[in-house]
Amino acid sequence: MTKMTTEEAFIKVLQEHGIEHAFGIIGSAFMPISDLFPKAGITFWDVAHETNGGLFADGYTRATGKMSMVIAQNGPGITGLVTPIKTAYWNHTPLLVVTPQAANKTMGQGGFQEVEPVSYTHLTLPTKRIV
């Protein structure tokens, strides 16, 4: 079995699911993963606001039939995805939403820009928190 980092495993799963485009805003919590995008053949489209990234991802998937993903920063970035998530839901568009979060041992302690992302995305199913 080949050893790989968590970031490499995440990228491998994206590749296995045919993700070639990601839209959103990259911050420090997501940089180790985004650094692997070019080698993995994933094009990242930087946007000025997470809402735009979510709408771009929805539009890309509807126009091409290929799934993409949106990346949002924790806190305000997550709340900015409410409209795109609901738009994708009503358009029956698969939308992969990826957001960073506080470390498990510090969750719920009111850390910098901490929100519980699953509570904002309960508008649709399924929603998963991956530790």
Language-model regions, residue ranges each:
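N-terminal alpha/beta PP-like core and its mobile active-site loop of ThDP/TPP-dependent enzymes
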Residues: 1-123, 129
